Regions:
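Alpha-helical transmembrane segments of integral membrane proteins
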Residues: 171-394
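Gly/Trp-centered helix-boundary motif
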Residues: 2-201, 205, 301, 337, ...
Length: 394
């Protein structure tokens, strides 16, 4: 009885070497790693925080308006239109009274008076249509106080002897366009937070760094000063210091000193953060190696310690900006900060102190909407940066 001899599978020996090389390359490719730096890891995590990205976009639009507000605002913020005071926001239309479709336009207005309150009333005249155009000539200005021009981003093209108000957010009691004033007010209300935080950053970095790195008696003195400052009520302290500013000072000087007042208490939280980080890092081996290498104390702090938690410092600064914005708004609203004719969101809200005025002209509260929006966007951005900088958050 014969048995079949088992046959072994045929092997293409001439392809074995090539296949092995390909598998080896695949393994090498799979085992290769990309080395990402700290900031790149932070950016990857930040990109997954959609709310923070939206906040960054909105704040970017705000600061773009701040830079180019002379061009973007439809009117000069100091110009008064006496015939259109306390005018409600105008309505933008695309379909006229006959049902025809147009590009965005507004109707003309007829000014009358309420027979009971004697307040001016503006009624749309549907027989007159005024298209809204882009790059429209209007009030003259100097962009950044350097480049003269009269072209505005949008507006109603002027007619000889005829003015048609494009008050998208209404006008105030003096006939100023609220939208233009909000754009210009953002220049102060949004920059006071950045400048105040910059001053607070310098103070917090220096005093917190000295306290955390050297410790001992210096640390005790600085910490007790911080404890005293934190125990002080913020708003009353700001009010008392701002009220001490002379009434005849130029507004630019008042703006500078209000910024300093806002930063007086803003540096304490950052200083405590830097101190705690330095206390935990100053005894590390790489710090000792830097000392043995002859590095000075300042070089050790700047080159080896601060970069290790720079992301936390940025997050802390970002979350502190809303407090500065609210502080300026509160001081100006109460009349002890910036004053008219300076334009800021807080100064604009002085018209809304009277409850009866607010009831009759609620559009005077539009600056509140922008203050709340700016504060929320900074908080959302700070939350996203904090989550991105935290290594324990995935």
């Amino acid at each position: 009885m014969s048995t079949a001899k088992p046959t072994s599978p045929k092997r293409n020996w001439w392809n074995f070497g090539k296949k092995g090389q390909q598998e080896g390359k695949a393994v090498e490719k799979d085992e290769s790693f990309y080395r990402a730096g700290q900031w790149q890891l932070v950016w990857w995590k930040f990109r997954r925080h959609k709310l923070a990205q939206i906040a960054m976009l909105v704040l970017g639009i705000f600061y773009f308006i701040v830079i180019f507000d002379e061009f973007i605002a439809p009117y000069d913020p100091q110009k008064r239109f006496k015939d259109y005071s306390t005018m409600a926001p105008v309505s933008v239309h695309m379909i006229d009274a006959q049902g025809n479709v147009h590009l965005p336009f507004i109707y003309g207005f007829e000014r009358t008076r309420d027979p009971v309150t004697l307040r001016p009333v503006y009624k749309e005249d549907t027989s007159k249509i005024y298209p809204i155009g882009l790059f429209v000539p209007g009030d003259e200005y100097k962009l950044w106080s350097l480049f003269p021009g009269n072209i505005h981003l949008f507006g109603v093209r002027p007619e000889p002897g005829k003015f048609v108000p494009l008050f998208l957010l209404g006008s105030d009691t003096l006939g100023h366009d609220l939208l233009s004033r909000i754009f210009f007010g953002a220049r102060i209300s949004l920059t006071v937070g950045l400048i105040g935080i910059l001053l607070a950053f310098v103070l917090g970095l220096i005093l917190g760094g000295i306290s955390g790195f050297f410790g001992g008696l210096v640390d005790e003195i600085i910490m007790r000063i911080i404890d005293v400052l934190i125990s002080l009520p913020t708003i009353p302290l700001w009010m008392s210091l701002a009220a001490a500013l002379p009434q005849d000072w130029p507004q630019l000087k008042v703006y500078f000193y209000v910024t300093i007042i806002l930063s007086i208490l803003g540096w304490t939280t950052l200083a405590r953060t830097i101190r705690s980080k330095l206390l935990s890092l100053r005894e590390e081996d790489y710090v000792m190696a830097a000392r043995l290498d002859g590095e000075s104390d300042g070089q050790i702090i700047a080159r080896y310690l601060l970069p290790g938690f720079a992301s936390y410092i940025i997050v802390s600064l970002t979350l502190s900006i809303p407090g500065m914005i609210l502080g300026e708004t509160a001081l100006s609203f109460l009349g002890v900060g910036l004053r008219a004719p300076t334009i800021s969101w807080g100064v604009m809200l002085q018209d809304a102190q009277n409850l009866q005025t607010v009831a009759q002209t609620p559009w005077l509260l539009w600056p509140v909407v922008f203050v709340v929006l700016a504060v929320l966007m900074f908080n959302f951005l700070g939350d996203g940066m904090r989550d991105a900088a935290d290594p324990y958050v995935t």
